[in-house]
């Protein structure tokens, strides 16, 4: 090696331990054929600078940039990115598969439910509409007027009233029930109970005969006491009415003859049958 190597030891050949010149020429000649199969180590021709550039270009490089395969972080990042893309791919591909595979099943299972729900929903909506019927002012007035007269209606009366105000008997019945409930709740909230019927009014009658003896004159104190016990205010009687009552009492006592218990004519007369 020392015999053939006549050049200085600072050449690129000595640094890179490249083969001899004959081998280099052979490699240069065979280079185009072998380039297709794989890169060869070095080819040197011409001056030193050109040979160094050729040697650098002829190095087996995987890519002109830094290879990230040696970095563990990049390897982990690449693995996670691949996993993420795979998940996205599955998510993107899953809906059409699920929709294509499962679409007939829910339609078969849910179609009866939908058919059942649609009439049910329509029935509920119809019931709600029936409950929320808006009565006109004339209908409300007639219903309230009849309610004040009679709180409970029989079936014929209900039908007659419904025909008059252009409603159904069921609507009239429900309105009466709701109105009775509202009235009852209003009384309960106000703390008002059903007031009892007022007792019959007591009228003070002047006493003209007491213990079989006529009363010639009525005293004002006795009349006031009688009216107070009867619950009638004393002011209801005026002075003229009092005088009239006294005059009637005197006239009645004067007009009635008082016969003695033992009259001579009555004792002498004898009836024969």
From Swiss-Prot:
PANTHER family: HOMEOBOX PROTEIN NKX, HOMEOBOX PROTEIN NKX-2.2. The homeodomain is essential for interaction with OLIG2. It comes from Mesocricetus auratus. Transcriptional activator involved in the development of insulin-producting beta cells in the endocrine pancreas. May also be involved in specifying diencephalic neuromeric boundaries, and in controlling the expression of genes that play a role in axonal guidance. Binds to elements within the NEUROD1 promoter. Residues 128-187 bind DNA. GO terms for cellular component: nucleus. InterPro entries: HD, HD_metazoa, Homeobox_CS, Homeobox_NK-like, Homeodomain-like_sf. It comes from the Eukaryota. The keyword Transcription regulation applies. It is found in: Nucleus. GO terms for biological process: cell differentiation. Pfam families: Homeodomain (PF00046). Keywords: Activator, Developmental protein, DNA-binding, Homeobox, Nucleus, Transcription, Transcription regulation. Belongs to the NK-2 homeobox family. Residues 1-56, 91-131 are annotated as: Disordered. Its main location: nucleus. This is Homeobox protein Nkx-2.2. Interacts with OLIG2. Gene3D superfamilies: Homeodomain-like (1.10.10.60). Signal peptide: none annotated. Residues 20-38 have a biased composition (Acidic residues). One of its GO terms (molecular function) is cis-regulatory region sequence-specific DNA binding.
